[in-house]
Amino acid sequence: MRQSHPSRFLAIVFLSGSLALAQSAITPEQRTSRYLENVRKQPSLTLAFLREMPKGGDLHNHLGGAIYAEDLIDFAAQDKLCLDRTTSVLQPGPCDSSCDKQAAKPAVECGYRDPNFYNQLIDAWSMRNWERGHESGHDHFFATFSKFGLATSNHTGEAIAKVLQHAAADHLQYVELMHTLGGRQSAELGAKLGWSPDFGVMRERLLSGGLKDAVTTAREELDRAGAIVQKDLGCGTPSALPACDVTVRYLYQVLRGLPPEQVFAQILTGFELASADSRVVGLNLVMPEDWYVPMRDFNLHMRMLDYLHGIYPEVHISLHAGELAMGLVPPEGLSFHIRHSIELGHAERIGHGVAVMDEHNALELLREMAQRKILVEICLTSNDVILGMKGDDHPLPVYRKYGVPVALATDDEGVSRSDMTHEYLRAAETYNLSYTDLKNMARQSLEHSFLPGASLWADTHQFHAVAACEADVSRNEKTSPACQKFLDSSERARTQWRLEREFAAFESKF
């Protein structure tokens, strides 16, 4: 007769219970992190994982470069534009009546019937099929804007709608778009009134001379564009696209390659516009940093910002700085742009920051950036194709080592032929970043957005929530009254809260 073994039975029950308890002790974030580690050597599965991952905000996105060439072709065809076949530069009509290869100025719509012509446009207006050696990535990249620029003039609303659709597909919650709103009007006014080295005189001259009209023009442009976005996306209707849920704000984009009187006029327009319209949350200075005028006038531009920041201290500033590499400019040109952008230009965020280790006292600067919580907008694909900076040559690991906050960004995703998902993929594969690393970058993007209001986070090292919402963050349940009151008081916190809810939904799949 077989004897029973109650002790063995109890041991099995105990072990089963312990295993279940251990499994339940693993957090959803840990399970999700394990999944990423398990598929890390399978790029297609990693890509699928990252495609669905919530990514927070894209803080460095130029509207003019965000549109894919295929959409630009459509815009140009709608406007009956022509192409200089030799240079691939758009021209106003009338176009040649023929689409033959002999036509020097064919209509852009000829591309719909000629695949070779269509592909020529895409390659000329983007980095597609660009190869190192024939033309530098830097030169090809920046040349695209003068080629397709005419196509964007009348399609701001449609372009914004396209960007938001891409953002929604990438599971972004927020986008800050750089755009020169009413910029031509203020630049022309600056040229008309002329230059004075006395910034106070310049400001009064511009304000009394009609600069407020440029601000009004910019706001009207946003009104028109916003109406088109709502219509194209079906926002507020039963057929609304997911892009309607992406929050968009704008940075006034100053063209720093212009003469000083025009740059000052645009900077002043940016400060005035951001002070008057909540849709515009700050300003930035753009155009290639290594070009002659931006290099010559760099500190002059910083002094302009310093002066106007004193008058408009609430207006946020993000600056392109350190989008440089050895050989592109003389060594001394690499040595101060990031520091001066922060200390003189009052930048709260730095775009690119690739040349940080070429700065004077680079390690001291890194510690200062960490202490002051100056976020760096990391544009991996852009830095590769423009500067050839990638892998170990890129300072992303250095920024992370020194505790400088970082967030991934697309820069000009249409020209680069990339998107935010592939920025995350490049970061994960190149630097072996964990799910938690990527998650915290997404959180940092919203923490350092220029949205108004208090942060959801009391601590951005471990991401502990403020007291009112501390218990709510870890529970995927109805928000407590205290937390809801806090969220109602802050647009920034509401956007961060939405990201946390989307993280919870994403992690529940694993």
Q: Model-flagged regions — what are they?
A:
Residues M1-L10:
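Bacterial N-terminal signal peptides that target proteins for export
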